Amino acid sequence: MTRQLTGRSYRFHLGDLKVRFTFDSPTQGSFVVIQGAGLAPDGHAETVALDLREIRAGVFLNSWTEASGATVTHVEDFENGTVYSNVTVDGKLYNLVGTIEEA
């Protein structure tokens, strides 16, 4: 990996959905929902197994499945501070675009 993510935390701002995400290791992450926007309860926290792949320098494909069964797939462009997110909750797909800031 060109960019070292392990041990770093970021704020993902996806419209009304706001999450603080920490890369615990290359295969594990943890998050806290700051503002759930109806997709998750505010304050929900979870540790998840990651499938994290570097696409090119500073751009990662990151996906995981949450305990609820919700799935999340991100394209995280740290060079440009942009996150593209596909989230499924209760079988419904949400496509979101937002910003990444180091926490």
Regions found by a protein language model. Give the residues of each.
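Beta-strand secondary-structure signal
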Residues: S9-R11, R20, A49-D51, L61-S63, ...
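Short, solvent-exposed coil/turn segments at beta-strand boundaries
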Residues: R3-T6, T22-S30, I55-G58, E76-V83
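Feature targets compositionally biased, intrinsically disordered low-complexity regions
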Residues: T6, L14, Q28, Q35-A37, ...
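Tryptophan-anchored aromatic micro-motifs
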Residues: M1-V19
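N-terminal glycine/threonine-rich, aromatic-flanked beta-hairpin/loop signature
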Residues: V19-R53, V89
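Contiguous, well-ordered beta-strand patches that form the walls/edges
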Residues: L39-E76
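Beta-sheet ligand-binding and adhesion/scaffold domains
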Residues: L14-D16, L61-A103
